[in-house]
């Protein structure tokens, strides 16, 4: 009997925590519903083997239903998510994949679709996502899980960290962590809803 009561108590606490996280997320991204957004983007590329980080300027454009573009140096370098299609442009050369071909982007896609929908899509059920409230900011960490060792070796990123201003719904940063301590960090300023 004690085990049953303990199990029910644990389940209740888990449900309350999941509901609280979903509620925090919905409040934090509520301004996106029905709006597009733009911002100035600053990219910082950190390579553990190099002494100095490289920085560059660009723009962030987000529009519904599922388009997110970060263009750096006039589009010479860019990240574009259009639904399930992901395009990375590096020095003018395009690399295209989809969330079906490259599963590490599937949860990333679902999270951004939920953000652009103003929080109406539930992310609480996504096991690869953790949501943490840090003062006035909401921090979403997406840690893709590989199905096997081969897929894990092919993964470009070990995690994605999104920081959202909980009061204004403004996306503050996106950090894409790579292997061996390398990362690319995008910080966003002059955020505007349209």
Residue ranges with predicted function:
Residues 42-48, 71-73, 89-91, 176-179:
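A generic structural motif
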Residues 124-127, 131-194:
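Gly/Pro-enriched, hydrophobic low-complexity segments
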Residues 1-4:
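Positively charged n-region of N-terminal signal peptides that target proteins for export
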Residues 94-137:
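Flexible, surface-exposed loop/linker segments and immediately adjacent secondary-structure boundaries
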Residues 54-57, 75, 82-83, 155-160, ...:
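Short, surface-exposed coil-to-beta transition loops
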Residues 16-56, 63, 67:
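N-terminal leader/targeting segments and the immediate start of mature chains
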Residues 7-17:
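Bacterial N-terminal signal peptides
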Residues 59-110, 184:
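An acidic-aromatic
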């Amino acid at each position: 009997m004690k085990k049953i009561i303990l199990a029910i108590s644990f389940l209740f606490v888990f449900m309350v925590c999941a509901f609280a996280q979903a509620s925090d997320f919905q409040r934090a991204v509520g301004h996106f519903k029905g709006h597009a957004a733009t911002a100035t983007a600053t990219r910082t590329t950190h390579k553990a083997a190099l002494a100095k980080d490289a920085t560059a300027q660009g723009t962030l454009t987000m529009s519904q239903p599922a388009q997110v573009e970060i263009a750096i140096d006039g589009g010479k370098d860019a990240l574009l998510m259009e639904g399930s299609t992901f395009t990375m442009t590096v020095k003018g050369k395009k690399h295209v994949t989809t969330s079906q071909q490259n599963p590490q982007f599937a949860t990333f896609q679902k999270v951004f679709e939920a953000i652009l929908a103003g929080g109406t899509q539930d992310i609480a059920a996504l096991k690869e996502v953790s949501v943490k409230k840090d003062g006035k900011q909401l921090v979403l960490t997406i840690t893709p899980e590989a199905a096997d060792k081969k897929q894990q070796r092919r993964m470009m990123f070990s995690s994605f960290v999104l920081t959202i201003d909980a009061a204004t719904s403004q996306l503050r940063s996106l950090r894409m962590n790579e292997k061996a301590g390398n990362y690319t960090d995008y910080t966003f300023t002059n955020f505007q809803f349209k």
